[in-house]
């Protein structure tokens, strides 16, 4: 069964995700992929918050990057892992490294074969068929990417951090102007929400305040 849990902010929703997975998180090995944070400048407390949120609810977690890796590395390093968590940061950098390494193809096959995928922010966005609807936000890596197909794990795209004051300008001035088209299947998530996916069925869940 295909299972995904796509969050806006995993530090807030980790307990809900763990409950929905339905197994003792201490018995689940998780790869915490922080690749998207590599080009980000300034304070990265949010990265620590996401990692610590998952650790707090009990996941057996280790850090991992897909940068400079190959499919053979993933087969060796991640084959026995129960959950692949792809965290936030720069979605375009993440996509570029996924393309270079072959992670995009490897993760599609792995999820189809039953490996659980969790995402936060950029890690949720990239699960979509295509990320071009957010490309006005950041022109970095466009030339290298050329096309903007995501992992294609779901048939919609997550817009995270809805209602968060720090993202208000990017939504009002860029993202909504690009995305406001009938062909775009978009799910807006605030930081207490996540989408849980089982095969072709999905629903929005929300953790209480």
Residue ranges and their predicted role:
Residues 1-26, 32-48, 133-209:
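C-terminal and late-domain segments of enzyme folds
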Residues 6, 63, 85-86, 117-120, ...:
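General beta-strand structural signal in soluble alpha/beta enzymes
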Residues 9-14, 66-69, 101:
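Short beta->alpha connector loops
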Residues 37-99:
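Portal/gating segments that form or line small-molecule/metal binding sites
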Residues 58, 81, 114, 154-155, ...:
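Short, well-ordered alpha-helix to beta-strand connector turns
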Residues 77, 101-114:
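Catalytic-core regions built around general acid/base machinery
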Residues 92, 124-127, 194-196:
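Short, active-site-adjacent cap segments at secondary-structure transitions
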């Amino acid at each position: 069964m295909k299972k995904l849990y796509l969050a806006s902010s995993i530090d807030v929703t980790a307990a809900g995700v763990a409950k929905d997975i339905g197994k003792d998180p201490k018995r689940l090995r998780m790869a915490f992929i922080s690749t998207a944070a590599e080009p980000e400048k300034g304070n990265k407390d949010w990265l620590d918050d996401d990692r610590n949120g998952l650790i707090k609810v009990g996941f057996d977690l280790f850090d991992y990057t897909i940068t400079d890796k190959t499919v053979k590395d993933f087969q060796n390093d991640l084959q026995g892992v129960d959950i692949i968590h792809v965290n936030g940061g720069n979605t375009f950098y993440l996509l570029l490294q996924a393309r270079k390494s072959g992670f995009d193809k490897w993760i599609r096959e792995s999820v189809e074969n039953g490996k659980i995928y969790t995402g936060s922010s950029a890690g949720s966005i990239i699960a979509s068929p295509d990320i071009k609807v957010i490309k006005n936000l950041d022109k970095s890596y466009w030339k290298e990417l050329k096309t903007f197909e995501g992992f294609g794990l779901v048939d919609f795209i997550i817009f995270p951090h809805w209602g968060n004051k720090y993202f208000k300008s990017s939504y009002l001035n860029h993202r909504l102007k690009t995305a406001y088209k009938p062909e775009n299947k978009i799910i807006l998530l605030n930081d207490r929400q996540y989408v849980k996916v089982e095969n072709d069925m999905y629903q929005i869940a929300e953790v209480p305040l």
